[in-house]
């Protein structure tokens, strides 16, 4: 199993959980990946994938080099275009650097034992595919799309932005790599419909592979009353991780007086994720600020996440200052092992992202018994049953988001509880990692045995 990136986003979580649960179905997985930072950091591969067989490419020195892509080893490019970030967008990477990336990953795959593997499970569409094709042409490949590669490809097809000087070469590569995979795993029914036309692959090679949750970690363990207040005191006052425009964790901290919104017994709303443009955090903050006067009790909004120093567009703290909304809190980046505690100290998860290809945090929140508010598009539209497990709103509609916040916070909580119960049942019926890993093992067996894909898209949940 290989992915070019250091642990940061959802694809790393997927790789970690699959590698942990696949042995139950007879498959052992080694992980070749990127790494950043010292041992103990969440972005350090050995720490993040602790207990697994990990072969990591250390990007730490490259990240601070004058040109990270000419360092040794070269830093990872990105499917996202963020000004000033060390990981420049793939579409701006020239052929010389591309060849260096391929050569680097040929060596890394060899060190991880790719030559003796039954198959290669490659996350995203990156130069790892080219490295695998050149160095190990006889080992079958499974591609795993996580959505960001599709967003970059769609942007190229719509007319590449300025600075994407090598966009067409990368578009051709992504399509060629996809066509070279025996199967392509995608996150949602929406992707099942979009991918064949976008990448030029046969529909029968597509396998629906939703993200999941660990049932041993994510469950209903609600913190209420004094225990809830103590949790937020610890995360916001005693051990703050929020960060301002400096990017330094702890540069946003709160006092005991600031915790007043948590003391009245009103519901707590929580956002979990990165501070990227598609997440629409500024819209959420403004919707919350406008809804405050309509809440029947103080209803704090906690922003949990934001990889330190990484943001696009308006910084969330700047929007908080602009709106004067003292009930919005920046809790900063926490490890995935702490996420269940944060969810259980809240009442509703809110995800305003307009281009979310899946939305794993929705499933994790539902597995903790939380109803969710999300946008009626892409992955969330497939996960959330509007009116039953949560609320769906139109993309980029601040008014609709505000109405959903008011509805979720209203009354005595009976409606939240009803939808939370339905969310809990739905998550456990459809998105358990052990069951999804067992389904993936069946796909592995078909590919390793050279069986052709079956007619129509497969799915991990019901055998592929």
Kindly give the residue locations of the regions a language model identified.
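A conserved catalytic-core segment of Leloir-type glycosyltransferases
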Residues: 30-115
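Carbohydrate-associated surface elements
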Residues: 190, 212
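Conserved acidic donor-binding segment of nucleotide-sugar-dependent glycosyltransferases
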Residues: 386-387, 391-398, 407-413
